[in-house]
Amino acid sequence: MASNNSIHQFSIPGLTGGMVDFGAFQGKKILVANTASECGLTPQYKQLQELQEEYKDSLVVVGIPCNDFGGQEPGTADTIAAFCGRNYGVTFPLTEKLSTKAPNQAPIFQFLTSKELNGLQDDEIKWNFHKFLLDEEGHLIASFPSTANPIEAMLQYMPA
């Protein structure tokens, strides 16, 4: 049973069906990013996919599309999935499109940005591709701004 300050309590519909059950990722680190297909930072999909491939036994990358910043994720689920697969070879889980901001902020983003809920820190998502790192028990251990290179940001947290 996941504790209240663990991301393992969340299960979100997948972009193209099924569920992304964070509880199924127990024992692995989880890197969550709010993503967008029409953003200047969209090429980070490539780096996120490289992390997923390099550390597949100890890390799960999860992309959560959002249209909160500049309307840069206007597509349908099928359009987003096709774009990510065709352009970046994305194989990591993508959830349905969610909101990162109030008043419609999704519960998972409430958890990731509230110290009261995650036990570590309050945080504000200011743009697409903000990244959150959670440990093997689902506890938040780090947050990286949108401009942080995912691979460089993760170096200190992953085995050499």
Descriptions of predicted regions:
Residues 1-23, 43, 106-107:
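N-terminal "domain-start" segment that seeds a small globular fold
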Residues 28-29, 38, 42-67, 84-88:
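Conserved helix-turn-beta segment immediately C-terminal to the redox Cys motif
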Residues 34, 58-76, 91-102:
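Thiol-based oxidoreductase modules, predominantly thioredoxin-like and allied folds used
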Residues 78-126:
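Short, internal strand/loop/helix patches
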Residues 110, 114-160:
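Thiol-/selenol-based redox modules, centered on thioredoxin-like
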